[in-house]
């Protein structure tokens, strides 16, 4: 088991029964789990589920557009079913800091 500094985690991506945890330094860690489980764990640390395959660290959001988020320099798609929750959640996060 490896310890990861959550402040450095930029986003989570689910692929093929694994969740890939990407950091701002370019490191990627692979965990065999579902995005549902991992996003619930990370949610309490300021992560937001934005797509069936992605959750982002709101600390690293650079821009929010209609269909994508720029997070730590990477374009992350916003899923249709998550779209209505993204902006209010981000504004609440920024307002709570």
Tell where the protein language model's regions lie, with residue ranges:
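Conserved binding/recognition cores within well-folded domains
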Residues: 1-71
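Eukaryotic intrinsically disordered, low-complexity regulatory linkers and tails enriched in Ser/Thr/Pro
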Residues: 1, 8, 25, 70-74, ...
């Amino acid at each position: 088991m490896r310890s990861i500094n959550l402040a450095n985690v930029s986003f989570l991506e689910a692929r093929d029964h694994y969740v890939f945890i990407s950091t701002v330094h370019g490191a990627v860690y692979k965990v065999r789990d579902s995005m549902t489980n991992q996003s619930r764990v990370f949610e309490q640390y300021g992560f937001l589920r934005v797509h069936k395959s992605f959750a982002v660290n709101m600390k690293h959001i650079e821009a929010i557009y209609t269909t994508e988020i720029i997070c730590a320099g990477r374009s992350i798609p916003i899923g249709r079913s998550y779209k209505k929750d993204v902006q209010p959640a981000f504004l609440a996060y920024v307002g709570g800091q």
